[in-house]
């Protein structure tokens, strides 16, 4: 649940939210995957990977390795040198966080009258698009590729700790924007450790009049043995209008219980 969490370039004195239009004509705002990645890396305190612009482009320094810098282990890199380039695809993949409620062209009128009055100056005017909504996004982690890059492989205990630190960050994620701190802690979460590396539940959270489509989630969960056996569902009570249906249909646990179970499974995977 967030409010006006990612702005684009804007036009004149109008700050525009990042948004997209679906075929039905409804407009939805989104938080870009790059913005989410920035917040995750910052809050994990792994935003210390050295960079340079020796090749006329800012990129990670050629001598950085995944052993020393978890950021490029999790989110990949491209290093360009005179002899060619080295690429590591992201092992932790993010989707955009797309609003579940449509944008209705609300705007906020702004001025700097308080400052201008101090020196008898004219105040400047501006407008910002505003939107408060629940957002849905997907994180996919390839556990087999964590901590492995060419001839480098870190200890399994370190692989486990990196993923656990990532899960802790996601559970309590927040975002600073324009003087606000937006709480991005998950209110509903579904996932698990699967045999197939498939984001089964991506784009499967649908909201109607603040009611979550529990039947759709159940149908995905029951679609194959992988999801039937390995799916965990967590939620925060008091958010959705059809809470009784959610409990009856999905049998969720608390968000805290879900993340605790996920971390236990990660430790077991790397044991």
Q: Where in the sequence are the language-model features?
A:
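RNA-binding basic/glycine-rich loop and surface signature characteristic of RAMP-family CRISPR effectors
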Residues: 1-271
């Amino acid at each position: 649940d967030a409010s006006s969490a990612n702005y684009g370039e804007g036009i004149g004195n109008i700050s525009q939210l990042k948004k997209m239009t679906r075929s039905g004509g409804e407009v939805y705002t989104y938080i870009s995957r790059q913005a989410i990645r920035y917040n995750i890396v910052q809050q994990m305190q792994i935003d210390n990977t050295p960079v340079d612009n020796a090749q006329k482009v800012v990129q990670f320094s050629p001598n950085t390795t995944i052993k020393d810098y978890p950021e490029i282990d999790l989110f990949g890199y491209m290093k360009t040198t005179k002899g060619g380039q080295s690429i590591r695809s992201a092992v932790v993949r993010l989707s955009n966080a797309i609003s579940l409620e449509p944008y209705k062209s609300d705007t906020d009128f702004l001025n700097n009258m308080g400052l201008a009055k101090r020196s008898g100056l004219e105040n400047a005017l501006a407008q910002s698009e505003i939107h408060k909504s629940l957002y849905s996004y997907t994180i996919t982690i390839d556990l087999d590729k964590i901590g492995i890059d060419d001839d480098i492989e870190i200890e399994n205990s370190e692989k486990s700790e990196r993923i656990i630190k990532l899960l802790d960050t996601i559970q309590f994620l927040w975002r600073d924007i324009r003087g606000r701190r937006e709480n991005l802690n998950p209110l509903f979460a579904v996932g698990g450790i699967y045999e197939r590396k498939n984001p089964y539940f991506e784009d499967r959270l649908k909201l109607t009049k603040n009611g979550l489509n529990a039947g759709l989630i159940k149908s995905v969960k029951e679609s194959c043995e992988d999801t039937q056996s390995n799916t965990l569902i967590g939620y925060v009570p008091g958010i959705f209008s059809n809470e009784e249906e959610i409990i009856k249909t999905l049998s969720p646990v608390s968000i805290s219980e879900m993340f605790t179970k996920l971390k236990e499974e990660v430790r077991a995977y790397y044991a």
